[in-house]
A protein has these predicted regions:
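Active-site loop and adjoining helix of the penicillin-binding protein/serine DD-peptidase-beta-lactamase fold
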Residues: 146
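Small-residue (G/A/S/T)-rich helix-start motifs and N-terminal tracts that mark the onset
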Residues: 1-130, 134-141, 149, 154-292
């Protein structure tokens, strides 16, 4: 089955639900500090798209990460701090990376390219989005990429595989599988149904209102995913299948993103920031086993 609009998972695929999402969320313990709860390094945003940095950081903070280090451009950094003063903008230890949101490969300067490359070569789990997708081959640690159809088409083209956005849309689960196999990464392919493939795991996520098709929605998803990956970072390196762990976490992020969209919408229009602000309730519903 290849209809991306169907409400059911294709044969052989897992359908994401609140219980699976709950298991991917790292709960704080009595002996935790901000470091043990996960530190997310963030290199997102640009002079052209500074808001993407704000949205991703906001979403990560509201999903429950212990600490965020934002290391993007100065203008975006000022906007991030104005919204979230608890964010740290000094370099230092991180346990996972979120890179690429709010960047455009065509306008990315050498400094940004070098900084993202250095992050990806640390061997840490990384969420690679948008304007950093062309750099995924430089990563030395486990990676989850978060393309939409057009971005996946460009990513595959860079690997010598021709597939138009229309072809990918016509068989989204099949192309998500092929991309994961060819690129050696976990793939979260965004759409009305989101398809996640990593290692031996295939998950379909059908959650959220069509109002989620709004500017900045993907930046919020990146922040949610970055937060969950940072929380899971201690168990990823020693896992028998690190990409399968990333797939479980990525599917949970997609479910939370969709549920937060439903909560924020209430049947009406929403903005990306509305979705980020609804994230604590979406997390709570997952932990309680409720929600869609």
């Amino acid at each position: 089955m290849s209809d991306a609009q169907d409400d059911h998972a294709p044969d052989g695929w897992i359908r994401q639900d609140a219980e699976r999402t709950r298991r991917a969320i790292r709960l704080p313990r009595d002996d935790d500090d901000k470091y043990t709860r996960g530190v997310l390094g963030v290199r997102t945003g640009s002079d052209r798209y500074p808001g993407a940095a704000v949205l991703g950081v906001e979403a990560a903070a509201r999903t429950g990460v212990g600490m965020i280090r934002y290391l993007g451009p100065a203008g975006a950094s000022a906007s991030v701090l104005a919204r979230r003063p608890e964010v740290v903008t000094a370099d230092g230890r991180v346990q996972a990376w979120l890179v690429g949101s709010g960047m455009d490969q065509a306008h990315r300067d050498d400094a940004a390219t070098d900084a993202i490359t250095a992050a990806l070569r640390q061997g840490l789990p990384a969420v690679v989005d948008a304007g950093a997708l062309d750099l995924v081959g430089r990563a030395t640690g486990p990676v989850v990429v978060t393309p939409h159809f057009r971005e996946l088409s460009r990513l595959l083209d860079g690997a010598g595989i021709e597939a138009s956005a229309e072809q990918i849309a016509a068989d989204a689960p099949g192309w998500a599988e092929r991309a994961a196999q060819e690129l050696g990464v976990c793939v979260l392919l965004k759409g009305a149904t989101t398809y996640v493939v990593g290692g031996g795991t295939r998950i379909a996520v059908r959650a959220g209102t069509p109002w989620l098709a709004t500017a900045g929605s993907g930046d919020v998803l990146g922040g949610v995913l970055g937060s969950l990956v940072a929380g899971a970072s201690a168990r990823i390196p020693d896992a028998a299948d690190p990409l399968a762990v990333l797939a479980d976490v990525a599917a949970a992020a997609a479910w939370l993103h969709g549920r937060a969209g439903d909560i924020a919408s209430g049947g009406g229009p929403i903005t990306a920031l509305d979705v980020a602000e609804a994230m604590p309730r979406a997390v709570r519903e997952a932990l309680e086993g409720s929600g869609a």
